[in-house]
Amino acid sequence: LLGGFGIKYEVNFAAFDRLDEKGFLDARSGSITEETIRSWLLEPLNVNGREVRYRFPNQRARRLARMYGKFQRDEFEGLDVTTLRSSLMSVEGIGPKTASWIIRNCLGSDEVAIIDVHVLRACQKMKIFPENFRLPRDYEALEQMFLHFSAAINVRPSVLDAVIWSEVRKARAV
């Protein structure tokens, strides 16, 4: 919920670290409010030795507070991946990519793929995905194609999408 269009990975990571340092990830008391999260996100972040401001602190604080409330109720325990993704996507700000990210990183599941613009473009260049497919509109179809491709080359989807993302990101930085 911290990342997305217009937020660089490094800034996202710094914001995540800030929330973790403040106890957001450990809290279970329900004491963390939208206002508290906003104040944490408004403080300048250290990114590669530079102070930067986080984009969209108000919107993200609202979304994180709502998500925090949902997780406090343990609403998602014991759900299968398909049901869990649907439940996650019912929360404002969570689309198929973020839901897949949560499922992958919280459950260690390889039943999902994290398809972002980097993976989309790379797979289109390799002719794995059709050129006319777009995110988020075609996410589920793209994910199925990616999972089939991953199985065909005998590479875990979690490894394949991470490697593609990393390599495309590095190539763009050059």
What are these regions (language model features)?
Residues 1-22:
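Extended cationic-aromatic binding surfaces that line active-site or macromolecule-binding grooves
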Residues 2, 6, 56, 99-101:
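Bulky hydrophobic/aromatic packing residues
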Residues 5, 10, 27, 121-123, ...:
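Residues in flexible loops and secondary-structure boundaries
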Residues 6-10, 51-59, 151-155:
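Structural motif
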Residues 18-19, 35-36, 139-140, 166:
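Short secondary-structure capping/turn micro-motifs that flank functional sites
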Residues 20-92:
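Alpha-helical ds-nucleic-acid-binding substructure associated with the helix-hairpin-helix region
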Residues 58-70, 77-85, 90-174:
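C-terminal accessory module of base-excision DNA glycosylases/AP lyases that mediates lesion recognition
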